[in-house]
Regions:
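Structural core segment of the AMP-binding/adenylate-forming
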Residues: 69-70, 97-181, 503
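Conserved AMP-binding/adenylation subdomain of ANL enzymes
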Residues: 224-242, 250-290, 305
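Conserved ATP/PPi-binding loop(s) of AMP-dependent carboxylate-activating enzymes
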Residues: 372-376, 387-421, 459-461
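Conserved AMP-binding/adenylate-forming core of the ANL superfamily
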Residues: 22-23, 32, 40-85, 89-93, ...
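ATP-dependent adenylate-forming carboxylate-activation enzymes
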Residues: 82-83, 100-118, 130-137, 266-286, ...
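Gly/Ser/Thr-rich phosphate-binding loop
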Residues: 177, 289-294, 303-365, 378
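Conserved adenylate-forming
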Residues: 67-72, 186-199, 203-245, 256, ...
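AMP-binding/adenylate-forming catalytic core of the ANL superfamily
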Residues: 109, 116, 126-131, 403, ...
């Protein structure tokens, strides 16, 4: 069976078209159409306040005009370093209306990492949080010569009538101003800045967990295409949906969900701190979302909250999960709370806008699978050695895809672009670096990142497979499998398991738990897969998106 025969189509929901007409134009044009049609409709709920599409139309126009009047031109980069809050939405839409490129910057980066990213993209303007301005940015301001304007926003500076953020002292060669002051003092109509489908709209940096962070250039056409695929897949009832997600907008998954809500006129609930479980539970209760999105680790945090488990989930249609593997037993536990068939695992990456696969919205969902390739997406699994030869369906290899959602390339990284985007068989293919397989029904299973695969005596150990086994043990709350150099065998690695104990076993002695886990591994795992080293930690480090940070674990090993 060939991948070109698209064996996954037989598993599509009824009514989902395998191909689709891809929209043209720009994302800004799409936003404006929706905002003008429904100005009084709620666009976003945030900390008890509501921003309408009309508010967003006006404020984004003022923001865009302000960018133009301080000298920014089409193709210049505006960087946003905020948690999920209304100002982020204003900056997204306003940046695109000005013809500029938006780039997200994680608030969790160190000053040196911030400086690298701002310089790498030659950012002309930065929108940052008041708490971050003094703690981080002011320390590196002098090392970013391209940056001319810094706009400072605050948590309580809401759409209208919130607490004002005082102006900060100017920095050498830079203008520093409160975000809302900047917005309010400019006219609501920007100058025309027409963008084409092939122009870059988002410059989103990869998390840097596998090396130096790189900026993925995503075009208006990429984002509109992926939105169309997502909407075709989900069959959203636009007037009847409310979206709530803990994915931060500085991450492509969060930016995509937020932008999709704007593009389809769907209200969204903004979560500034996804680790504040009590706040998420309160918003779930009060806003009644139909769609919830989170990474697995945050769903696990919610499952540990008694108030979450008592919520009425009858109005929730889907709980989407992505960005990391979700242990099968935990998926079933979540569905025992939110309802059977509501868990929707997806897979993608920053470089693909981000979605590549998803489990059917209404049809059969397979636990442990990231679902089926989306409409208008070519998909293959190829050999790990050279990335050229298709492996048979059912065998493991590198996942590659081609489609309108695939990025233009990496910003100023031609060699890395050539390595990731390879032209063959009449298409440009994104080589994802993920290892996986496809079953006979077309469902995809991501086994591991190629860089997370551990080699033991010539055998491949897939970390997600081993971690999934350990999640069945009651003492394991969170775990991560990594490979360490083997000084006795340079061609082999030593398997190490880092464990954050579950709440029920937190007080148990490490030695007793380790002995129990070793016995468990002997029963459940082949000897070469079983960890040789166990480490117990109070908290496993997470990335800014909530994924286990294996780079940090390897760095301290």
């Amino acid at each position: 069976m060939s991948y070109d025969s698209k064996p996954w189509l037989k598993s599509y929901d009824a009514g989902v078209e395998p191909e689709m007409a891809l929209p043209g134009g720009s994302l800004a044009e799409r936003f404006l159409q929706v905002f003008r049609e429904s100005p009084g409709r709620p666009a976003a709920r945030y900390m008890g306040s509501t921003m309408t599409f009309g508010d967003l139309l006006e404020m984004s126009g003022r923001f865009a005009r302000g960018l133009q009047e301080i000298g920014l031109r089409k193709g210049d980069v505006v960087t946003v370093q905020l948690p999920n809050m209304p100002q982020y939405l204003v900056a997204v839409v306003g940046t695109l209306r000005a013809g500029c490129i938006l780039s997200g910057l994680s608030p969790l980066l160190t000053p040196d990492e911030m400086s690298f990213q701002l310089n790498d993209c030659a950012s002309k303007a930065l929108v940052t949080l008041d708490l971050l301005y003094e703690a981080k940015f002011a320390r590196v301001a002098g090392s970013v010569p391209s940056l001319r304007t810094v706009l400072v926003a605050g948590f309580l500076e809401t759409v209208r009538g919130g607490a004002a953020v005082p102006d900060r002292p100017a920095l050498p060669d830079k203008t520093v101003e409160a975000f809302m002051n900047f917005v309010d003092r400019h006219a609501a109509e920007p100058y025309e800045a027409a963008c084409a489908s092939g122009d870059t709209c988002f410059l989103q940096y990869t998390g840097g967990t596998t090396g130096t962070a790189k900026g993925a250039m995503l075009t208006h056409g990429n984002i509109l295409a992926n939105m169309g695929q997502f909407d075709q897949w989900m069959k959203f009832g636009h007037d009847a949906e409310t979206l709530l997600t803990g994915f931060p907008m500085f991450h492509q998954a969060g930016l995509f969900i937020a932008s999709s809500a704007l593009a389809f006129g769907m209200p969204q609930v903004l979560i500034p701190d996804p680790r504040n479980v009590e706040h998420i539970v309160r918003e779930l209760r009060e806003s009644g979302p139909s769609f919830v999105g989170n990474v697995p680790s945050l769903y696990l945090m919610l499952l540990g909250n008694e108030d979450f488990r008592k919520l009425d989930f009858s109005g929730v249609k889907y709980c989407m999960s992505g960005a990391a593997a979700f242990p099968v037993d935990k998926v079933r536990l979540l569905e025992s709370v939110v309802g059977a068939g509501k868990m929707l695992e997806v897979w993608g990456m920053t470089e693909t806008s981000p979605l590549i696969t998803a489990n059917p919205a209404r049809g059969r969902k397979k636990a442990g699978s990231v679902g089926l390739p989306l409409p208008a997406t070519r998909f293959r699994i190829v050999d790990l050695a050279h990335g050229c030869t298709e492996v048979p369906v059912g065998e493991e290899g590198e996942l590659i895809c081609s489609g309108a959602q695939v990025m233009r390339g990496y910003w100023n990284r031609p060699a890395e672009t050539r390595n990731a985007l390879r032209e063959h068989d009449g298409a440009v293919w994104m080589h994802t670096g993920d290892v996986g397989r496809m079953d006979e029904d077309g469902y995809v299973y991501v086994v591991d990142r190629a860089k997370d695969m551990i080699i033991v005596g010539g055998y491949k150990v897939f970390s997600s497979e081993v971690e999934d086994k350990f999640y069945k043990h009651p003492a394991v709350g969170l775990c991560a499998l990594i490979g360490l150099p083997n000084p006795e065998r340079p061609d082999s690695e030593v398997v190490k398991l880092v464990v954050q104990k579950s709440p029920a076993c937190r007080e148990a002695p490490d030695g007793e738990v380790e002995a129990d886990l070793r016995a468990f591994a002997r029963e459940k795992l082949a000897p070469y897969k079983a960890p040789k080293i166990y480490e117990f930690v109070d908290a496993i480090p997470l990335t800014s998106v909530g994924k286990v940070n294996k780079k940090a674990l390897r760095g301290r090993a």
